[in-house]
Amino acid sequence: RFMRIGVNVEAVTDTHIMKINSVLLDEECAVIGISVSGRTEEVMTSLKAAKERGATTILMTSRKDKTFLGYCDEILLFAVKENLEKGKAISPQFPILVMVDILFSHILESDKFRREAIHEYTLNALDAR
């Protein structure tokens, strides 16, 4: 979805790819780490490495911890009920999806004319119309 409006993104869950990507980052890049618990070691390590390379770092989490400020430019907190990571009542990923949608909308609106034109180009490239 982001790529269709001209934002070059990559979703990475593999630890090895996270490590490889961390050496390819620079000040032109942004890294968004997502960890419901705020304790996912691979995500935190990747954010620290990205910060060292000059990338903008953003953490999406439910955990409020001042130590994140040492390597995160932005911390987006979302609310979850206790034990939701076990999926009993509502998926803990739901707030994350909402935040990603908000981010998408913000990026789209930041340069709407250009982003909509790029969206048209990508649809044409896919013969989606």
Listing of model-derived features with the role each one plays in the protein:
Residues F113-R129:
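A short, charged, Gly/Pro-tolerant segment at domain boundaries
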